[in-house]
């Protein structure tokens, strides 16, 4: 494992407690506080769905970010794109999940979600093509 991969994987894993906290928040939302988690009041069904989507994407994209960090070591990617790829993998996880939470309360923040999706598409294509090109 390269030093850059170790650094980015470490940063990603440090963010996992925020996903755990989000899970506790979702538990409170879905159970109306009956499992000891605080129950927010006044959420619409759409907001609850966006909370669920944000939390689900956070976990899945954190795992994908970890995978991409390792895959970048094996992909044939131009040196000038290595760090942008590493940062985009982690940023996409943060922006997509954060975008769902943001638009639950402020629909005008929708570009956060779309920026994350754009980064996710770009980095997965870059790494995928780089892996196919490597020998």
Cite the ranges covered by each PLM segment.
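Polytopic transmembrane helical bundles with strong interfacial aromatic enrichment
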Residues: 1-55, 59-135
